[in-house]
Design a protein with these regions (language model features):
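A short, exposed loop/beta-hairpin motif centered on an aromatic-Gly-Thr core
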Residues: 15-24
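Short aromatic-glycine-(Arg/Gly/Cys) micro-motifs in beta-strand/loop hairpins
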Residues: 1-15
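Charged, amphipathic alpha-helical segments
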Residues: 23-34
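Short, mixed-charge low-complexity intrinsically disordered segments
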Residues: 35-80
Length: 80
């Protein structure tokens, strides 16, 4: 099975947080909403797809791509 790997980037600290996996960007945004539920200002945070993890082959493809700023992702998620 292929899992997408994501991380939250802290623009102020200039570093990525721990990896988490999700089926797609929509599911990842739900996880982000839960993780940042207590944070008052989500503007300094963004979500990146860090790559894929193939559980059958044990291979990680580390192609990094920007998913979106947390403020926009959470706003779009609330509208769904």
């Amino acid at each position: 099975m292929i899992y997408n790997l994501y991380s939250i980037y802290d623009k102020d600290a200039k570093e990525f947080g721990p990896l988490f996996n999700a089926k797609n960007a929509l599911i990842a945004s739900r996880y982000v909403e839960q993780m940042l539920n207590e944070v008052k200002n989500v503007d300094p945070y963004a979500v990146y797809r860090m790559g894929e993890y193939d559980t059958e082959k044990g291979i990680i493809d580390s192609t990094v791509s920007f998913v979106g700023d947390c403020s926009e992702l959470l706003k779009n998620h609330e509208e769904c």
